[in-house]
């Protein structure tokens, strides 16, 4: 019976696998951790397996009906859904059993209550076979063959032959697969049998080892218990023996024969009693205790001890009767010592008062004088030598290293050794006494460089302040055209464009230049060279950024700092921003003083607008051509080639540094040698920001015009009715794109030699500066006056 039960369970599991049952992808209840699916799943009650198998078979038989019937009880979550599931399954099983010609066994409700046992397994096996039969009848792969058609008689021999061949092929395929399965099963069985025998042998071996280990463990436990018991007995014996050690010694002495070996004999003992003790013993109070000390010629030890005790009492009483000598204090000696100590204390207090009142004041005064002398010495020392020279081993390394123009990279070791800083002290004393002379020399050097500024193009920079830093944004530019003669047309092709360098882009062309061997010079020569070098640097910085709007410092303070370039207490700033900030005010003051002296000469000249009234016919024909595409410059070369005079009292609206008349005074040249420029070289103001009314533009500009006032020349007033062509040119210039000015001759005004000299001149290397030659003399250029165009009358 058990064998049949196992066989039915195995067949049931195989049928489920043939129907594509996947035990890994099932879920029936909330907790499926202990789900048991396999051949022995119904050996014990297994509700979860019952739910899964029944639902799978009914869903395989009729999916639509199964979904409709089990929609309220699948998945099974509680007792209510469990009862509903059993009810639906029982009804469906009864329908299958009641079909005609069905061999399905009789179904009872009790079969579904306990999902285990042979009857339940047999019921599930018949249900699985029924589902397999229904599935086989509906099997169709290509729509050409149905199993039920095999029972229909063949219509011809060919059809019967085809059926036979089809069945034969299927039978052969199944047979081959079955044979392959059997062979594979046999191979695996052999391998498993061998491994099973090995495992059995290993299991037997480990069982024997386990038994031996258990027996040894038990034996050790028995031995350990006996040892503990024996140790307890020995402890008890030791405790008993220690308590009866005296008795043991007596027994041992008796056993060893040590009894009666020693006898206390007092025959030779004679007791002598003092008179005081004898009298005491003869008193009536001691008569009762008075006994004989000898009995049978031997002294009695107990009585002798009692007599000794009485003798001790007598001795104590006699000692109490004796009175010892009394201690007498010598008060006179103590008083003498106290008086001596008091006098010594008064003398010490007197000495202390004298030290505090007299000597301490003198010592403090002397200490103060010494401190003042030390402070004076230290201050004088610091004036001559910086503090960092005392703190470091090499004081020269603390100074500013020689650098190229606007470069913050340190120079090489060879440059350090050849520099002036390594050969001369940090602060020459003989030059400190002549600050006024150095200041005057520096001022003259700055004014002397005024004529060199005309050789470079000027760009107006408007400062735009942001939260983090000041960004220089270029605005309207002032262009200086190339030299135009009457025989050369102004539309000449421009071959190269050289942009004006920015002060924020330091030049690094001579970063690796090797310094020459230093020649010994006097301190005055070194100072003069350094001042000239710094003045040239200041001029270049002011030309590159005339629009830097920052707080100005006093020229006197700046020149005092320049007078001693090697002073470590007040070193010069080595950043482009700080150089421009410190130089700008001093340069403006120098230019303002020059302008004030030269403005007197320009007031007596003729009206500045007289040159505009010159008829256009007097001009040469090549000079009349306007080339907007190539240079965007409107250049009019006058016949007389004289610079236009400046009208006295005219408003300042020019972005140029100074006019042509001022250049004539500085360069001491005649006006006929100077090239004239027209208004076309000036960019008109922005129509959205500044109106064409020059008077209102000055009022709206505010602080910006105040900063540019020092470098603006006097400009005459012009009306559009007098110069219609000039107004047309101005409108064309304002509407044209500013990007075209990149090819204008202003970028060609700075030649290669001049740009190289201005780039390399910004250096603190005096040897290298001495070797440099003066900049090549470029063509003398003058800048025209701007014309105020007033549209109010039109």
Swiss-Prot record:
Compartmental location: Cytoplasm, Cytoskeleton; Cytoplasm, Cytoskeleton, Spindle; Cytoplasm, Cytoskeleton, Microtubule organizing center, Centrosome
InterPro entries cross-referenced by the UniProt entry: HAUS_6, HAUS_6_N
Membrane-spanning segments: none
Keyword check for Transit peptide: no
Keywords: Cell cycle, Cell division, Cytoplasm, Cytoskeleton, Microtubule, Mitosis
Record GO cellular component, one term: HAUS complex
Gene Ontology molecular function terms on file: microtubule binding
GO BP annotations listed: cell division; centrosome cycle; microtubule cytoskeleton organization; spindle assembly
Pfam families xref list: HAUS6_N
Family classification: Belongs to the HAUS6 family.
Functional description taken from the UniProt entry: Contributes to mitotic spindle assembly, maintenance of centrosome integrity and completion of cytokinesis as part of the HAUS augmin-like complex. Promotes the nucleation of microtubules from the spindle through recruitment of NEDD1 and gamma-tubulin.
PANTHER family: HAUS AUGMIN-LIKE COMPLEX SUBUNIT 6 (PTHR16151:SF2)
Subunit structure: Component of the HAUS augmin-like complex. The complex interacts with the gamma-tubulin ring complex and this interaction is required for spindle assembly.
Protein name per the record: HAUS augmin-like complex subunit 6
Phylogenetic placement of the source organism: Eukaryota, Metazoa, Chordata, Craniata, Vertebrata
């Amino acid at each position: 019976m058990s064998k049949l039960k196992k066989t039915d369970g195995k067949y049931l599991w195989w049928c489920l696998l043939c129907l594509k049952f996947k035990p890994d992808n099932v879920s029936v209840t909330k907790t499926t951790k202990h789900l048991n699916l396999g051949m022995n799943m119904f050996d014990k009650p297994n509700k979860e397996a019952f739910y899964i198998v029944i639902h799978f078979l009914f869903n395989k038989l009729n999916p639509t009906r199964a979904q409709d019937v089990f929609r309220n009880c699948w998945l099974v979550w509680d007792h209510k859904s469990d009862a509903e599931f059993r009810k639906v399954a029982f009804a469906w099983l009864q329908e299958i059993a009641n079909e005609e010609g069905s061999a399905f066994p009789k179904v009872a409700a009790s079969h579904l209550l306990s999902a285990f046992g042979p009857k339940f397994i047999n019921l599930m096996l018949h249900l699985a076979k029924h589902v397999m039969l229904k599935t086989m009848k509906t099997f169709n792969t290509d729509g050409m063959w149905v199993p039920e058609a095999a029972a229909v008689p063949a219509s011809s021999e060919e059809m019967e032959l085809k059926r036979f061949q089809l069945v034969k092929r299927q039978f052969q395929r199944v047979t081959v697969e079955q044979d392959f399965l059997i062979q594979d099963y046999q191979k695996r069985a052999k391998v498993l049998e061998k491994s099973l025998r090995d495992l059995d042998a290993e299991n037997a071996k480990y069982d024997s080892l386990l038994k031996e280990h258990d027996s040894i463990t038990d034996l050790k436990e028995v031995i350990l218990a006996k040892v503990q018991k024996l140790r307890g007995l020995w402890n008890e014996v030791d405790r008993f023996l220690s308590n009866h050690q005296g008795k043991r010694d007596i027994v041992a002495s008796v056993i060893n024969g040590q009894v009666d070996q020693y006898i206390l004999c007092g025959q030779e003992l004679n007791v002598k009693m003092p008179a005081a003790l004898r009298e005491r013993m003869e008193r009536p109070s001691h008569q009762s205790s008075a006994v004989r000390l000898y009995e049978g010629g031997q002294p009695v030890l107990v009585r002798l001890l009692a007599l000794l005790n009485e003798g001790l009492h007598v001795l104590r009483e006699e000692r109490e009767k004796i009175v010892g000598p009394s201690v007498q204090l010598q008060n006179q000696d103590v008083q003498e010592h106290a008086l001596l100590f008091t006098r010594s204390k008064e003398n010490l207090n007197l000495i202390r008062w004298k030290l505090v009142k007299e000597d301490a004041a003198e010592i403090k005064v002397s200490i103060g004088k010494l401190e003042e002398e030390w402070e004076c010495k230290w201050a004088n020392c610091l004036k001559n030598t910086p503090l960092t020279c005392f703190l470091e081993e090499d004081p020269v390394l603390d100074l500013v290293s020689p650098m190229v123009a606007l470069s913050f990279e340190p120079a090489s070791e060879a440059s350090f050794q050849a520099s002036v800083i390594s050969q001369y002290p940090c602060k020459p004393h003989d030059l400190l006494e002549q600050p006024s002379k150095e200041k005057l020399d520096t001022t003259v050097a700055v004014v002397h460089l005024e004529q060199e500024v005309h050789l470079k193009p000027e760009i107006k920079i408007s400062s735009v302040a942001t939260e983090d830093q000041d960004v220089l944004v270029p605005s309207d530019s002032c262009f200086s055209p190339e030299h135009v003669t009457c025989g050369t047309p102004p539309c000449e092709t421009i071959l190269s464009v050289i942009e004006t360098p920015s002060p924020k882009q330091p030049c690094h062309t001579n970063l690796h230049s090797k310094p020459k061997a230093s020649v010994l010079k006097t301190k005055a020569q070194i100072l003069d060279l350094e001042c000239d070098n710094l003045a040239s640097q200041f001029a270049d910085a002011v030309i590159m950024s005339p629009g830097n709007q920052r707080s100005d410092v006093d020229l006197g303070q700046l020149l005092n700092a320049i007078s001693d370039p090697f002073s470590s207490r007040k070193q010069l700033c080595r950043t482009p921003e700080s150089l421009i900030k410190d130089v700008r005010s001093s340069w403006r003051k120098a230019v303002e003083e020059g302008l004030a002296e030269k403005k007197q000469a320009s007031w007596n000249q003729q009206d500045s607008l007289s040159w505009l009234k010159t008829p256009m016919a007097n001009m040469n024909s090549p000079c009349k051509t306007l080339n907007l595409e190539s240079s965007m410059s409107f250049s009019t070369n006058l016949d007389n080639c004289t610079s236009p005079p400046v009208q006295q009292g005219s408003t300042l609206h020019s972005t140029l540094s100074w006019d042509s008349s001022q250049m004539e005074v500085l360069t001491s040249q005649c006006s006929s040698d100077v090239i004239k420029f027209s208004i076309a070289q000036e960019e008109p103001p922005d129509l959205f920001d500044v109106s064409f009314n020059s008077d209102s533009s000055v009022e709206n500009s505010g602080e910006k015009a105040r900063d540019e006032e020092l470098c603006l020349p006097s400009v005459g007033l012009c009306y559009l009715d007098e110069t219609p062509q000039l107004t047309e040119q101005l409108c064309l210039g304002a509407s044209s794109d500013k990007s075209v000015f990149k090819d204008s001759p202003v970028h060609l005004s700075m030649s290669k030699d001049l740009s190289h000299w201005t780039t390399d001149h910004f250096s603190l290397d005096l040897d290298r500066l001495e070797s440099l030659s003066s900049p090549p003399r470029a063509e003398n250029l003058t800048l025209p006056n701007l014309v105020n165009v007033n549209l109010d009358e039109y």
